[in-house]
Amino acid sequence: YENNSVVATSASYGSLLTSLKLKKFYKIIGYYLKLFNYKKKFNPFPNPHIRTTGFLIKASDYLSYMSDKTIKSKEDAWCIESGKKSLTNFLKNHGFKIFVVNSNGDKFAEDKWKLSETFNYSNQEKSIISDKHIRKYLELNNNERKKFTFNTWGVY
């Protein structure tokens, strides 16, 4: 761990904006309202960000970011993780280096995050932690895994 850096247990290039889908035609008005809202809050794919399920950072840096934020909803939490004003973007704008580490102790820069095998790639065999999203991926068949991998990283 270095000054002006953050180490995370997993990351993603995924975007809530790009992954938003109209599932039922009769919900089209709600879909467009949500799309309009998401365009204000989230960048399209690729949207590199650390997953906030596990990361290491100096408390003072974290508190500096959180000083004007409140989390009242799941959407607020999503904005902190992957929004235009996310923790990752705040840290990048302040010159931080952002890494993912895996269970082998290997460190990966942003352009190599996928290769850490910690989230939605391969069998995630090198994850340090487990959460519902990691467990869900493990339950998928190969075709479903390919879709998740594509939505997360843009490639299989």
PLM region spans:
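ER/Golgi luminal nucleotide-sugar-dependent glycosyltransferases, focusing on the catalytic module
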Residues: 1-156
